[in-house]
Amino acid sequence: MKTAVIDVGSNSVRYAIMDENTTLAHKKLNSTVLSDGLFFSGKLSDDAISRTVSAIAAYCEEAVKDGAEEIFVFATEAVRSASNGAKFCKRVHKACGVEVDVLTGEEEAEIGFLGATACVKNECAVFDLGGASCEIIRGKNGVIDFSHSFPIGCIRLRDGAGGNKEKARELINSAFESMTIPRVNTLIGIGGTATSLGAMLSCPNKYDPKVTHGTKVDKRFLEGVISDFFGGTDMRLKYPCLTPNRANVIGYGAAVCLRVLEKTGAESFTVSERDNIEGYYEFIRNKNR
């Protein structure tokens, strides 16, 4: 049975058709920047809601054409923390006829770990950096022993720092200071920031998920990205693989990734193209068993 899974993130809406935990086609993405302005207002803007609902509706139509028998839509930190998150969910239901599953921070962390570590047997940690939050999870053989959602993401950081490198560092340190994160040897990065950084290293001219998967991103590279970004480098010119919206925030994302490496003691992270979409599919399968 084919199942469509739609991930409503803070920066983008993603779509994939799943069948027995196998992605049948490349994931598709529409960058709607749902969390734009959320840092200042505490709510989702009307324009961002309209862009995102339209993207979800288009993917629901595509799911029907692709032969999906079920369509699942889940949302993360932007909808979870917005004062008008319920309004957004009602708009989606009215336009598409589907319910939005707004995940808790713990559920968001769990599905990211499930997706990224399906083939990993040793102890490892996974971090999922989005537009409005960063989840860090550690475990082994599918058993999680540490999980926390931190209120820092590349869009939220952009809005809060306003282009100031030192202010960005202060906000990152503040977000992580309240929690001691376990040290790890193996760290896996998922989400748009991680995969974009992987592409910048492995296929800078054109993004290719088959190439980025498994790429190792180290501290030195992250420091270079941060220096370029805040130094005024045209990131799209240097890295054509980046979309305009991603190029506008990649320096903030790299700064958060660097702090994650410092907090966990890891020297690098490995990019995974398996992420919360695969994890959510496994999550709902487990609930229905």
Language model region names:
Residues T3-D7, C124-D128, L187:
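Short glycine-aspartate micro-motif
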Residues T22-L34, D66:
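N-terminal glycine-rich anion-binding loops that anchor highly charged ligand groups
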Residues S10, G131, G192-T195:
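Short, glycine/acidic-enriched loop or turn micro-motifs at the edges of active sites
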Residues A4, V13, I71-F72, A125, ...:
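Conserved beta-strand core positions
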Residues A132-R138:
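Acidic, divalent-metal-coordinating active-site segment for phosphoryl/phosphodiester hydrolysis
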Residues S10-S12, S133, S272:
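Short linear Ser/Thr-Pro motifs
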Residues I17-E20, G37-A68, T76-E123, R138-R289:
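Helical "lid/coupling" subdomains associated with nucleotide-phosphate turnover
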Residues M1-L24:
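N-terminal basic/disordered segments at the start of proteins
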